[in-house]
Design a protein with these regions (language model features):
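Conserved active-site and cofactor/substrate-binding residues in soluble primary-metabolism enzymes
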Residues: 22, 26, 65, 82, ...
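Short, flexible/disordered intra-domain loops and linkers
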Residues: 21-24, 56-62, 170-175
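Charge-dense, low-complexity intrinsically disordered segments
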Residues: 18, 57, 178, 182
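FAD-site-proximal beta/loop scaffold in flavoenzymes
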Residues: 1-4, 113-184
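Cofactor-binding loop segments of dinucleotide-utilizing enzymes, especially the Rossmann-like FAD-
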Residues: 15, 51-53, 161
């Protein structure tokens, strides 16, 4: 209610190494819809900041026509975006972003103002599991073989979000792959 009474800029997005981009897109669209219903969207500039190389990459190299579909929705709803973005610092009301080109070289520095922000973090595994030597990758996720068994300890199996899934492709700013492929089902 406080924001509605005194609206301002919104920044939504995903930090480098994030691997679950859907909730950030969903948040942007839900906020856009809600602010329009309240008739204050015209007073709320929105910027989507992401490590993805393009809108709709989703950590998967795109899904069908996700790039043009999401870009079109963002344009139609006046949501600006910054891709290939490395969040370098956050201060009260400001997100500092380095945007890189396709080779990873600095292209542009941004200071993005906000009154409300939601950035998806890069996930990490839990310390007790991550601390086991040779069990996990540097982010703390269990490295497994095709049978979902630890590559180092053949009596340890892993399923779900604790599994280390390699990126689908190399991107200028690190993006992870969503972990939906290794659920227990």
């Amino acid at each position: 209610q406080k924001f509605v009474d005194d609206p301002g800029a919104i920044v939504i997005g995903a930090a480098p190494m994030a691997s679950c981009f859907g909730p950030a897109y969903e948040t942007a669209m839900i906020l856009d819809t809600d602010l329009r219903k309240r008739k204050i969207r015209d007073r709320v500039p929105m910027t989507y900041v992401t490590s993805e190389p393009y809108i709709g990459h989703l950590g998967l190299g795109g899904v069908g026509d996700s790039k043009s579909m999401l870009e079109s929705e963002f344009r139609n709803n006046d949501i600006k975006w910054i891709t290939n973005a490395k969040t370098t610092k956050v201060e009260a009301g400001k997100l500092f972003v380095t945007q890189v080109d396709d080779l990873g070289n600095t292209y542009k520095e941004h200071e993005v103002p906000f009154k409300l922000s939601m950035m998806l973090p890069a996930f990490k595994g839990i310390e007790p599991v991550a601390a086991v030597p040779e069990l996990c990758n540097p982010r703390g996720f269990v490295m497994i073989d095709e049978f979902q068994r630890s590559k180092k300890f053949k009596n340890i199996f892993a399923a779900g979000v604790c599994v280390a899934i390699p990126p689908v492709e190399v991107t200028p700013v690190a993006t992870g792959a969503p972990k939906t492929g290794y659920m227990i089902e």
